[in-house]
Regions:
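The two-metal-ion catalytic cores of nucleic-acid processing enzymes
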Residues: 1-223
Length: 223
């Protein structure tokens, strides 16, 4: 049984993490995507409205992106096909229904605590220090803190500074080989705040190196 847990694009490659017969794998794949354009000749490929289209197979992702840049603004040359190349790769590589072995997928639950001297911490100006982080994964509770704590059911990780605390978060996630990181409001507060504080202590390239694929992408969500 083979299944993926994460896919990402980096330059001209597709990066994939998953499990094959219960064993973790991380692959770097050279993917050759396809797109489609109208044709006057009969074709086995058709649009949802029955228009004949021809398949264009690219040698790599760069070629496909250049093609899109060249033709996407031309009204009389519509491009068909999935231009989300990650989705296209997944649909081709895992064409049948993916059977996941949930016992292999490692889920990490994270929560952080901040000081509140200046009120509730602000994502736009993360000026309140993170003083404690908890991570639960594979039945183990980690507590990363700058103050000694007696918690018999936890692994207390004592650090000397917030800078060290932030680095330790990613050390634990990497050592435990987490597939999924979750928690209460983790997408809208916890992780953005951690990254905001991390940038006060570390260069961007250092932070990128902590990630499973060696890079990260952040996006702004307005609510």
């Amino acid at each position: 049984m083979k299944f993926y847990t994460a896919c990402a694009l980096k330059g001209n490659k597709v990066l994939v993490r998953g499990y094959n017969n219960g064993v973790r794998f991380t692959d770097t794949v050279t993917y050759k995507p396809s797109l489609y354009m109208r044709t006057d000749t009969p074709s086995k490929y058709k649009t949802l409205t029955g228009v004949n289209v021809g398949r264009i197979k690219f040698e790599n992702l760069y070629e496909a992106r250049e093609f899109l840049d060249q033709y996407r603004e031309l009204e009389d040359c519509p491009i068909y096909g999935n231009t989300d190349f990650i989705t296209q790769y997944i649909m081709e590589t895992y064409a049948s229904e993916v059977e996941y072995d949930l016992s292999k997928i490692k889920v990490a639950y994270l929560d952080l605590e901040c000081e509140t001297e200046g009120g509730f911490p602000n994502l736009d100006a993360p000026n309140e220090r993170i003083n404690l982080v908890t991570i639960r994964i594979s039945g183990v509770n980690y507590v990363i803190t700058m103050k000694p704590l007696n918690l018999p059911d936890c692994r207390v990780v004592l650090v000397a500074s917030e800078k060290e605390l932030i680095k330790k978060i990613f050390d634990i996630l990497r050592q435990c080989d987490a597939d999924i990181l979750t928690g209460w409001n983790i997408k809208l507060f916890d992780m953005p705040y951690i990254m905001g504080r991390a940038k006060l202590f570390y260069e961007e390239k250092e932070i990128q190196a902590w990630m499973p694929f060696g890079f990260m992408k952040m996006r702004i969500t307005n609510i």
